[in-house]
UniProtKB/Swiss-Prot annotation:
This is Histone H1, early embryonic. Pfam families: Linker_histone. Residues 98-124 have a biased composition (Basic and acidic residues). Keywords: Chromosome, DNA-binding, Nucleus. It comes from Strongylocentrotus purpuratus. GO terms for biological process: chromosome condensation; negative regulation of DNA recombination; nucleosome assembly. GO terms for cellular component: nucleosome; nucleus. Belongs to the histone H1/H5 family. It comes from the Eukaryota.
Amino acid sequence: MAEKNSSKKVTTKKPAAHPPAAEMVATAITELKDRNGSSLQAIKKYIATNFDVQMDRQLLFIKRALKSGVEKGKLVQTKGKGASGSFKVNVQAAKAQASEKAKKEKEKAKLLAQREKAKEKGCSEEGETAEGSRPKKVKAAPKKAKKPVKKTTEKKEKKKTPKKAPKKPAAKKSTPKKTPKKAAAKKPKTAKPKKPAXKKAAKSK
């Protein structure tokens, strides 16, 4: 029993091989283009040839569509009464329907455009927020500023090393001070030859 019920559900879900009866009737009348109106027989023939329909089952729906179309003003009955006469499409009603459909399509297009714009704005705002949050992470990157500190330390070390070099020439300057002392000791040696000169003067007297 469960299998039979499942098979029935599947058959109901299948899409119809033809549009609704009202649409088929409207297309048949517009395509036949009869000035005096299209009869029920002409409408049935057109539907049977152009649509995959079992006329025995659809005949009742076609008659209902004709009656409802006349009541709603979509169709005009030129001859007969009920569904046995001739029918034409109400041009004014058709124009009104076309304008209504156009308006609905425009409204749908506007709604779609607004939704797309809203989505784009949402994406752009998300991108801006993401970009705004990124600089916060960049603030934590003053690690590069630590590198110049190393350079200053290196410069300080370089400055300290030349201070040690001038100490060596200071020792060299102390050595030339000892040399003039030796020259002073040599001067009394030159004064000794002056004494014999005085002796020579006495002898000459």
